[in-house]
């Protein structure tokens, strides 16, 4: 079960139980994920669970009847559900809550139904019920249908199956039998009600002597055994899908009638088998049922040969009723098993794999009865032949030819090109899916390998390569599952190797991943220096004013000027301007299932005020079949990491530019040195923070994780392992870079915002000082109109220049300006320190409680000398002191004052 399936089921369960508030779905999801254990079904555990529920139930007979009915329909996951219900019977508190909840829901439903009835004078539900819904309702209520209604039900079933199959095979509709096949009852081979032998010359059997009665009854039985009414034994009309019953002349001798009643079940079973063969021979029921019906028809022919031989004996006067009973014994067992199988298939509405599951289970259950097991093995082997033919095409060639929707793997129409466009497209997961109800029970353990084998070969085929499995052999059903399991495993190993070699060697998957790492994870240092220098001015503009073609040209120039020019895949790198900033994107992704962040998706959009820096991201063009691994989801993760690191690099460049521009301020070394020192110190703290964060992400997160990925890719045995390793690499990078934790992400974004605002403030102040200095320089350096100043003029102008410099310095050190600037710097220092302490405190909590040991490295880097740890301890002590209640001083006799020795004078 995938993570999102667990999210969906937990949310649906909370909704059904009407649980609001509390711990929220996330707590229960986490518990389920940590405590999942596979349920292994055994006969003993299933039986004990069934007995426990039956003992607990008020109507155990109804429960056992329903259980047997579901079991006969081969319902999936029935035993795990029964086991869960048996566990619930032991938990009294949970059971009481569920009973109370069910009672409240029933009352709410009743009140809603009452309100609807009073609101409308004419009920409209009945008028909207279609014929199909009416038939389904009758089936659920177990109402008895007449023969004509049964025929309509069969026609409706065939129509439903035909519509489903034609919808899947839109290009090639399935053939159908002409209508007269179903309209002419004489073609069915079963009893025709009311068409028995002529009764004009029938003598009352009670008037005949005993020997004549026996002879007449034997003749009637020979007719009845082949589906024709006799003179004294006639078939009754069918009531629904019940077994055939017969009416025996009541005047028949009692001893003869008793023996006749023992033989008649053979005729009833023959009628059931004949109807099953004729019904399942229709195209709509699939090849497995066709093969089963054909195998049954072969056995029925042998049965008819036996009846013919008995008729020959009767004509010779050598067949008595006792001999008939003796000769029919072997056939009775065979026909009874065939009828039982036919009834089970009909009741379970089995098609394809579900039919094979039923036959396999029945063969396994007849382990002690060799003849019955041999019969079931014959039927199962015959019925499985078309299924194994589909299976062989799938695991040996990667082709599905399943016109009747019988195979365990279902194909969906998805375009592989959409992997590049649609984030939610799941080509690899949804192009081919497993249908649990169509998995034969003897292939349950290898269903995943069967799915993967065909998928691997199908990918290679779609790339234009012919695939021929060298280990291909015919698969034949046997109770020894190891025979065809080994064949499936050989095909799986071959398909895995073919696709893996194709992607790794011919399509150069690892080289593409290295190219993506070079650009998205900033592995190419000189390229980014060139690129950010070239695009700095353009990226400062709002998104609406940026010319994308200009950015593409600058990207091309930076690629050609750096060592990235040797990258063979550099032309696949593109530029994309995202519609929202990184924080909004990440919070939306993280808010899929959490109630706390759901409100953020409805907040006022900030996309209109985005700058190029906030919207900038790289994109990468990936072609099929590499897009199976480097799909849109993976590229989105790469983009998140890149935008995070790119913005950190931008903040670092801004702080470095502040350091360069601050050299001008060092000329004014009077009073300004006192309050400029605070700004310089804060800038260095910010720069130290940003650089350490970058170093941590690049060299302590991405590089080790990348080396693990490369090692895992070398040892991967199939493409699913490659996909899992790549996804794990990206998930670990996102987690360790603090991009999956909303709380850490918010604090980090606040720190980045403080750094950017500080650099903007310092740049404005430095620019103002530069303008004043430039104006003073022009005032000091201007000469006479006649030419440059002479030596005498320089000596005379020296006092004036010193006076001007003093005036500029005093202007910079003006008390009003100094106090305002100092307050601004103190405010920045206060905000930065508060957010950084908050980040360190949260990192400390997560590194200990969630076992995120990698985050401890960030703490040691940012707080290498314990400076922030002391401040955190001080803040914690102050908070605990404020939160501590004031303890009143108990009143009592005052303690004597301590004596202090006073030294002698």
Swiss-Prot record:
Residues 877-905 are annotated as: Disordered. Component of the gamma-tubulin ring complex (gTuRC) consisting of TUBGCP2, TUBGCP3, TUBGCP4, TUBGCP5 and TUBGCP6 and gamma-tubulin TUBG1 or TUBG2. TUBGCP2, TUBGCP3, TUBGCP4, TUBGCP5 and TUBGCP6 assemble in a 5:5:2:1:1 stoichiometry; each is associated with a gamma-tubulin, thereby arranging 14 gamma-tubulins in a helical manner. Gamma-tubulin at the first position is blocked by TUBGCP3 at the last position, allowing 13 protafilaments to grow into a microtubule. One of its GO terms (cellular component) is microtubule. It is found in: Cytoplasm, Cytoskeleton, Microtubule organizing center, Centrosome. GO terms for biological process: brain development; microtubule nucleation; neuron migration. Belongs to the TUBGCP family. The keyword Ligase does not apply. It comes from Mus musculus. InterPro entries: GCP, GCP_C, GCP_C_sf, GCP_N. Keywords: Cytoplasm, Cytoskeleton, Microtubule, Phosphoprotein. The modification Phosphotyrosine is found at residue 83. Component of the gamma-tubulin ring complex (gTuRC) which mediates microtubule nucleation. The gTuRC regulates the minus-end nucleation of alpha-beta tubulin heterodimers that grow into microtubule protafilaments, a critical step in centrosome duplication and spindle formation. Plays a role in neuronal migration. This is Gamma-tubulin complex component 2. The gene is Tubgcp2. Residues 887-896 have a biased composition (Pro residues). GO terms for molecular function: gamma-tubulin binding.
